[in-house]
């Protein structure tokens, strides 16, 4: 295999790993899709992860640069494995993390206000549309220990109440209707 072909193979695998990461974290092209750790989705992402792991393991690494990049890809696979496990065992995370998502969109995202508001609206709509599934996943994961989440949700509620007061600061161009 020519090094150009090998380099392209590395690039494609890097891209596929990034896409899987984006899917798990609901980033970029997946930002309007809420990743909910149903057994089917977890199975699907684990299959994808296993496929990518096999492809990375089978990569040629003819010199130190390729070995370094291959090592990086393996490290990234390890982090994705951890992310998959965290998503599976913490179905409440999207709800608890929303306050951080709001702050990221409000403070760090440099897209137009209209786009940022649209992204936030879609995310909230996805929570609303999937609330029964989310609650079922939480109940399935925690069962009788659901009460252990109460302090985390109470904190998240306080954070959201604080940020609700800052919405005018975050989005100064918006009207109440928006």
Task: Describe the residue ranges of each PLM region.
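N-terminal maturation segment of proteins
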Residues: 1-178
């Amino acid at each position: 295999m020519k090094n150009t072909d090998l380099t392209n193979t590395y690039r494609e695998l890097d891209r596929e790993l990034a896409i899987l990461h984006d899917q798990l974290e609901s980033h970029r092209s997946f930002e309007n899709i809420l990743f909910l750790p149903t057994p089917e989705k977890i199975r699907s992402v684990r299959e994808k992860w296993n496929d990518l792991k096999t492809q990375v393991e089978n990569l040629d690494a003819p010199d130190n640069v390729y070995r370094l990049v291959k090592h990086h890809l393996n490290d990234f696979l390890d982090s994705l494995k951890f992310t998959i496990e965290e998503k599976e065992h913490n179905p409440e995370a999207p709800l608890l993390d929303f306050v951080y998502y709001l702050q990221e969109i409000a403070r760090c995202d440099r897209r137009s206000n209209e786009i940022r508001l649209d992204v936030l609206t879609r995310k909230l709509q996805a929570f609303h549309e999937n609330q029964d599934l989310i609650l079922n996943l939480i109940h399935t994961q925690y069962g009788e220990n659901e009460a252990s989440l109460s302090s985390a949700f109470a904190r998240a509620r306080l954070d959201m109440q604080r940020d609700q007061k800052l919405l005018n600061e975050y989005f100064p161009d918006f009207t109440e209707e928006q």
